[in-house]
């Protein structure tokens, strides 16, 4: 018996930014606003937000999109941000001299940001997402809750 190989088409691309000199709380404030949105909508949101964390996140999203367009032949209009997370990186510690021979610790925090883009044109539920973009996210949240329990 001859078995056919399943040609599985990958629908996700990612970009990872490590050791970004920024607090995780400040980066999460921006990441929470863009999670689940389309690529084009995300670019507009990040350009208009007044936070310093927007620039490195914008570069990461552009890098992930370029990976998908160049390596996987994805269409820019059908990309959504399926996963975006911020993890804590190492903290650089140094001391600043203060009055009367004392010292004060300075903690310089870093973070690791992961962005995963999904091409929804390859998904069977593409038409459903176009009509109701929130429905796809609600279903994925339900499956995550079921997996946890």
From Swiss-Prot:
Q: Is Transcription included in the keywords of this UniProt record?
A: no
Per UniProt, the keywords (alphabetical) are: Chloroplast, Plastid, Ribonucleoprotein, Ribosomal protein, RNA-binding, rRNA-binding
The subcellular location is: Plastid, Chloroplast
Which BP terms does GO give this entry?
translation
PROSITE patterns reported in the protein's UniProt record: RIBOSOMAL_L22
One GO MF term on file is:
structural constituent of ribosome
Write down the CDD domains for this protein, in alphabetical order.
Ribosomal_L22
Q: Which GO terms describe its cellular component?
A: chloroplast; large ribosomal subunit
Q: Which Gene3D superfamilies match?
A: Ribosomal protein L22/L17
What is the annotated role of this protein in its UniProt record? This protein binds specifically to 23S rRNA. The globular domain of the protein is located near the polypeptide exit tunnel on the outside of the subunit, while an extended beta-hairpin is found that lines the wall of the exit tunnel in the center of the 70S ribosome.
- Outline the subunit composition: Part of the 50S ribosomal subunit.
PANTHER family reported for this sequence? CHLOROPLAST 50S RIBOSOMAL PROTEIN L22-RELATED (PTHR13501), LARGE RIBOSOMAL SUBUNIT PROTEIN UL22M (PTHR13501:SF10)
Q: Which family does it belong to?
A: Belongs to the universal ribosomal protein uL22 family.
**What name goes with this protein?**
Large ribosomal subunit protein uL22c
Query: What is the species of this protein?
Result: Pelargonium hortorum (Common geranium)
Instruction: Identify the gene encoding this protein.
Output: rpl22-A
């Amino acid at each position: 018996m001859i078995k056919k190989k399943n040609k599985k088409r990958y629908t996700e691309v990612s970009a990872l930014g490590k050791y970004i000199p920024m607090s995780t709380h400040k980066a999460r404030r921006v990441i929470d606003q863009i999670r689940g949105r389309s690529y084009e909508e995300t670019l507009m949101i990040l350009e208009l937000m007044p936070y310093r964390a927007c620039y490195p996140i914008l570069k990461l999203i552009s890098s992930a999109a370029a990976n998908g367009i160049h390596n996987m032949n994805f269409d820019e209009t059908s990309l959504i941000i399926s996963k975006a997370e911020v993890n804590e990186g190492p903290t650089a510690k140094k001391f600043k001299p203060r009055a009367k021979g004392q010292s004060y610790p300075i903690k310089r925090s870093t973070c690791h940001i992961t962005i995963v883009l999904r091409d929804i044109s390859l998904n069977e539920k593409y038409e459903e997402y176009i009509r109701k973009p929130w429905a796809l996210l609600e279903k994925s949240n339900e499956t995550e809750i079921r997996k946890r329990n």
